Each structure stands twice: as structure tokens, then as C-alpha cells.
Amino acid sequence: AYVPDSDAFSWECLWDKKYAGKILMKDSYRDAYGTAVIYAHAKELEEGTVSVEDLMNDYSPRAMEIAEKYLKAMKPNIAGWEADFGKEMMTKNKAWLNMTWSGDAIWAIEEANAVGVDLDYVVPKEGSNIWYDGWVIPKYAKNPVAASYFINFMCRPDIALRNMDFCGYVSSIATPEILEEKVDTTLDYYADLSYFFGPDADSIQIDKIQYPDRKVVERCAMIRDFGDKTKEVLDIWSRIKGDNLGVGITILIFVVVALMSGWMIYKRWQRYSRRKPVSYTHLR
């Protein structure tokens, strides 16, 4: 294995120089900020003196300073900031670590298995963020009835299952039909899902990526909106990513721009040189 379980089980792996050039990071300032402040306080988290929720939602000047410091220290290890191509890079064995979302991990693992590449997904021991996408009907919607029908349709257990199979992400629907369909008795892994399916679901053989154990969820928290601090966090993110192109690519861009400028000047000169002399007739 390129990455031992012991390494992958801690955010420290993103700062480990032995993985330099083999790490992909989500192009998401929220995820990056949360990851940095969590790892920066790994010792305090282990001691129980701080919580993941407090850390990820701390936008004080000191917290922002720490986040920027740790992200800059991590940056030399990063091969690229990705929004969607990370899962494909992992399946092609071009990256060893990818800070990614669970649904993308499901897709990548399935695709990788088809070509003989073994991937896995873990939530680091220090903790992480819990997030979700949701549908809402805005108050200015022109057809709220149709929107309601759509949401109700997506909440049907049979449709929710089809949607999960397609996108890899878990539906919020927690009916007996969903649980029955997702149980996999071939697995050695048992999860306490009583937080999701109710008290009777405290030892279930099920996919650990889509349905993590209660203990995993308890060390995670939601990132709240940055509010009036959004601009400051985005400024940090811009500074982190700003020179990520590297010297070689930067030089290449300058060369291309110079060549294009030269070509445009040359074409203009050609058009000018082909113009016929103009003769003037003076009337007396």
C-alpha cells in the first residue's frame, strides 16, 4: 500500500513530506480551513480541552492566523487543488491521498476496483466536518406546488435508494426499506447507526463510508457560515492558492502571452503593409 492505515488515520499525512506531490486537496476554503485548525489543535482535541465544532467555527484573528500558517506549510505537498477531478486521479493511481467527500470516494473506489486499484476512505481520528446538500423552496418560487411534488418524489424510499446508488451520497430518508436494502451481511464491519435509523440499529453490517459508526460521527461537526468573516477567509484562501501554478507554468504562461501579443502585432503589420497607396486629386 502507498499509504498505511496508520498514516491515513490522521490529518498529519497531509503535512508529511514523504507524500509531497502525491496529495490532492479539495478546492474548498471551508474544508481547507476546518482541516487546518483541527490538525493544528490535535493535541488539545486528544486531551478533550477543545471540540471540533468550536475549532471549525472559530473565526477569530488568531484562528485565521493559525489556519493560514498551517495551510502554507502544507502547500508544498499539494499536487493540485481539485473540485471534481480528484476521484479520477485516484483511480488512475496518479495521486495517493485526496482530501475528498464521501460520495466522491464511493465513486472512486468502485471505479478503481474495476481496474485493479485498491482505494479506501477514512475519517481521521482528530475529526472532520459533517455536511449536507438540501432542497428548499424559496419564497419567490413561481411554482411551489411542482417543487413540493419533486421533493416528495425524491423522498420516496425507492427513489432515495436509486439516487444514492447513482450519486454515492446518502439520503436523509431513514425508513426500514432503506436499512433493509443497505444491509450487507458479507461485511465483517458492524456499525452503530442508532443515531440514524433508531435504537434497534446499534450493530449493523453496512457500508462504513455511506453510514459511518456513531463514534465517527461524534468526532465530527458542522461548519457554520462564515458570515461577515467570509471575505477575510477568502483572502486567506487566495493567498494560499495564489502562486500555486509554480515557476515553470508561470513562465509558460508569460511565453504564451508574449507569443500571442507578437502574433497580433505581426498580423496588424501585414494588414497595414498590404494597403495600396492612396492618391489624392486636388480640385482647383
What do the predicted segments below correspond to?
Residues 269-277:
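Transmembrane-cytosolic junction motif
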